[in-house]
Swiss-Prot record:
This is Orotate phosphoribosyltransferase. Homodimer. Orotate binds at residues 121, 149. InterPro entries: OPRT (IPR023031), Orotate_PRibTrfase_bac (IPR006273), PRibTrfase_dom (IPR000836), PRTase-like (IPR029057). 5-phospho-alpha-D-ribose 1-diphosphate binds at residues 117-125. It comes from the Bacteria. Its EC number is 2.4.2.10. Pathway: Pyrimidine metabolism; UMP biosynthesis via de novo pathway; UMP from orotate: step 1/2. GO terms for molecular function: magnesium ion binding; orotate phosphoribosyltransferase activity. It catalyses: orotidine 5'-phosphate + diphosphate = orotate + 5-phospho-alpha-D-ribose 1-diphosphate. The keyword Magnesium applies.
Length: 194
């Protein structure tokens, strides 16, 4: 799937938004990918994750033994990637501000984990998720995401396999360009809700 095809899926779902957005990283952007709108359509989610699963298989073969995603944004693509790859799909969620496995989910030292995210911007949530997995003794071999907003600049600590890259400028709140300063900011993400 090409970058244009991926972005067309987001546009068709009404998920490629323009305005002034506060990202989960705290940075500001004039573009927001509202993946919840994409994930509300099972067929669209399946198409995107099927393409990502093919890309992961081309790079990793059968190496992953389990998929782990960070809640909340990674749960739907993590589930669909697990379905596409025939693997178990788990997720970590925040407890007292830190990601942890709950709900009876367990990993062992023999598990080779593929982390699945929706969108990667700075890689912070990814690194926090990977840190939680590392504490279990399992090995994170790579991360996969639908869109890498950093254009390949985010360091998640393991190889990052993105269905596409879509570099979108993001700014600290005190360094906004005039066009963003003129628009009220909204915070559409999920960080800080739990």
């Amino acid at each position: 799937m090409t970058r244009d095809e991926v972005l067309a899926e987001f546009r068709a779902a009404g998920a490629l938004l323009e305005g002034h957005f506060i990202l989960s990283s705290g940075l500001r952007s004039g573009v927001f990918l509202q993946k919840a709108r994409v994930f509300s359509e099972p067929e669209r989610t399946e198409r995107l994750c099927k393409a990502l699963a093919a890309k992961v298989r081309a790079e990793l073969g059968d190496a992953p033994t389990v998929i782990v995603s960070p809640a909340t944004g990674g749960i739907v693509p993590g589930y669909e990637m697990a379905r596409q790859m025939g693997l178990k799909g788990l997720y970590v969620e925040r407890e007292n501000g830190e990601f942890t496995l709950r709900r009876g989910f367990e990993l062992t030292k023999d598990d080779k984990v593929l982390v699945v995210e929706d969108i990667v911007s700075t890689g912070l949530s990814s690194r926090e998720c990977i840190e939680a997995i590392n504490k279990t003794g399992a090995t994170v071999i790579a991360e996969a995401c639908l869109v890498d907003r950093s254009g390949g600049e985010a360091d998640v600590g393991v190889p990052l396999i993105a269905l596409t890259e879509y570099k979108v400028p993001a700014y600290p709140a005190d360094q906004l360009p005039p066009e963003l300063e003129a628009i009220p900011a909204i915070k559409p993400g999920s960080r800080g809700l739990a």
